[in-house]
From Swiss-Prot:
PANTHER family: HIG1 DOMAIN FAMILY MEMBER 1A, HYPOXIA-INDUCBILE GENE 1 HIG1 -RELATED. Keywords: Coiled coil, Membrane, Mitochondrion, Transmembrane, Transmembrane helix. GO terms for cellular component: mitochondrial membrane. Belongs to the RCF1 family. Its main location: mitochondrion. Residues 3-94 form the HIG1 domain. The gene is rcf1-B. This is Respiratory supercomplex factor 1-B, mitochondrial. Residues 83-115 form a coiled coil. Gene3D superfamilies: 6.10.140.1320. PROSITE patterns: HIG1. Associates with the respiratory chain complex III/complex IV supercomplex. The chain crosses the membrane at residues 30-46, 66-83. Cytochrome c oxidase subunit which plays a role in assembly of respiratory supercomplexes.
């Protein structure tokens, strides 16, 4: 854990954008872009010599291109050997940064789950309280009906319906 804190606190090892990475690599190994530029220039000169029908100059530029490519390859290998330990440290740092991001993402996901669980429990408690209150009210309503006679209940439930009103109208009864 102390190693991780040391690496994360080191200002040399910080997250960087692709442009920053390009600039850093350009500063670390300036010979590689120089070799690439020399190769491109030799190819350009060979092309121009071919257009001018100067085969001697064209062959000389193709040889120069081969030398420039060899120089570039040598710069890549030498730079790789020279910066081997730093690249290894950077890879370890990037791995730790990814682990930290994954852990933060996991923690955020767990916090979200806990919040949803708390919300669900609150909803269930409110729902249970409402159902208990509803049960108490229905029990209170049942207690009121227990003291009444059953015939009164039937009379109350039976009212004048549409059919009764039509029959009464046909028979000529007035209410």
């Amino acid at each position: 854990m102390a190693d991780q804190a040391d690496v994360l606190a080191d200002p040399d090892f910080e997250e960087e954008t692709s442009i920053q990475k390009f600039k850093r690599r350009l500063k670390e190994e300036p010979l590689i872009p120089l070799g690439c530029a020399a190769t491109c220039y030799a190819l350009y000169r060979a092309y121009r010599s071919g257009k001018a029908k100067d085969s001697v100059e064209m062959n000389r530029m193709f040889r120069a291109r081969i030398y420039a490519q060899f120089f570039t390859l040598l710069a890549v290998v030498a730079g790789g050997m020279y910066y081997k330990t730093e690249r290894k440290q950077r890879r370890e740092f990037e791995k730790k940064v990814e682990e930290r991001k994954a852990q933060e993402k996991r923690d955020a996901w767990l916090r979200e789950l806990e919040a949803r669980d708390k919300e669900d429990k609150g909803w269930k408690e409110r729902h249970a309280a409402v159902s208990v209150t509803a049960k108490k009210e229905t029990e209170g309503a049942v207690d009121k009906n227990v003291n009444q006679a059953p015939t009164e209940e039937v009379v109350e439930k039976r009212g004048t319906g549409i059919l009764d009103a039509v029959k009464a109208l046909v028979q000529g009864k007035k209410d």
